[in-house]
């Protein structure tokens, strides 16, 4: 079997799919994208195609190493996201050829189900509470919400009070009936993260995500030393070599590699194993589409240290398409009591509606993340 063609489709809301075709008619799908930089990743995918056309798709490990090492310059969000989507599609092909789901090819299940959590938006505490109540109605009891809005390097007590007030009202409204993580989104400087974490500790969040940017990872162990709240990070780390450094430094309780940013299934399985060796939990980052989610689920079901799975159903970014709009076998992604079950169809287990993909790719928006500014006019972290 040989790879004959690679096609990319930029899609709403902010996704990109790729299709790898073979000379035997077997097709694999992947989801390579950096949100807001889809065209750049698309260019990288087609550059990698030069290494792939005419090659045997079954040699996933070798093709991964070729894409990673054949260029003198490597790594980073663009290149690793391009590799990630290609890698997903290669695993999809292998599973279809062998008539087995990817988790079966990786040694089989370590669990029967995995807890899903849902992002909750809202500018006011009442909006967040209303969103949680609606999601509880369809079975969710675990959530993630923004821990704060933009925050100055050294900010005032009003900004701290606003963040704490939202969390306090949520805990008061639901008590211990729900769990929620707080995503700082890298918006907070290390000095302000110390203040916020201390003030939030009485409300027992499930985790604090990206309390500081990945570029400031040296602060993770320092922040972890001052709190009992688990610290989570990893969505902006792109290879096992970056994760190696933070695992060795300590401080993180939960790793959140993104299966569409960190080299795909091949690389993230290695990252999961590294995390287990350090007694660190795994919770793959996934605010993206159905192929990315499927890839995450296969890793969850073969990694003992996986604890829960993010998914984007109803997320505020989803303008123009929802999580399963491009999927024919929607029933396979249904949740029972807030848990996903293993996907059982061969390959990734996603039956893509190719006609719909082609149609909506004709008018895909160029999504950009917001540009925020502080009151003094300086650029703020989004």
From Swiss-Prot:
Residues noted as binding Mg(2+) in the record, renumbered to the chain: 183, 209, 235
- Quote the catalytic residue positions: 185, 285
What is the E.C. number? 4.2.1.6
- On whether Lyase is a keyword of this UniProt record, the answer is yes
Q: Which domain of life is it from?
A: Bacteria
A Pfam family matched by this chain, by name?
MR_MLE_N
Q: Which reaction does it catalyse?
A: D-galactonate = 2-dehydro-3-deoxy-D-galactonate + H2O
Report further notes. Answer: Reaction proceeds via an anti dehydration.
Q: What pathway does this protein act in?
A: Carbohydrate acid metabolism; D-galactonate degradation; D-glyceraldehyde 3-phosphate and pyruvate from D-galactonate: step 1/3
Q: Which GO terms describe its biological process?
A: amino acid catabolic process; D-galactonate catabolic process
Outline what the protein does.
Catalyzes the dehydration of D-galactonate to 2-keto-3-deoxy-D-galactonate.
What NCBIfam families is this protein classified in? PRK14017.1
CDD domains xrefs: D-galactonate_dehydratase (cd03325)
The residues annotated as site (Increases basicity of active site His) are 258
**Which keywords, in A-to-Z order, does the entry hold?**
Lyase, Magnesium, Metal-binding
Which PROSITE patterns does the record associate with it?
A: MR_MLE_1 (PS00908), MR_MLE_2 (PS00909)
Q: What is this protein called?
A: D-galactonate dehydratase
Per the record's keyword annotation, is Magnesium included, yes or no? yes
What cofactor requirement does the entry state?
A: Mg(2+)
HAMAP family with a match to the protein in the record: Galacton_dehydrat (MF_01289)
The record's section on InterPro entries has:
DgoD-like, Enolase-like_C_sf, Enolase-like_N, Enolase_C-like, Galactonate_deHydtase, Mandel_Rmase/mucon_lact_enz_CS, Mandelate_racemase_C, Mandelate_racemase_N_dom
- Which Gene Ontology terms cover its molecular function? galactonate dehydratase activity; hydro-lyase activity; magnesium ion binding
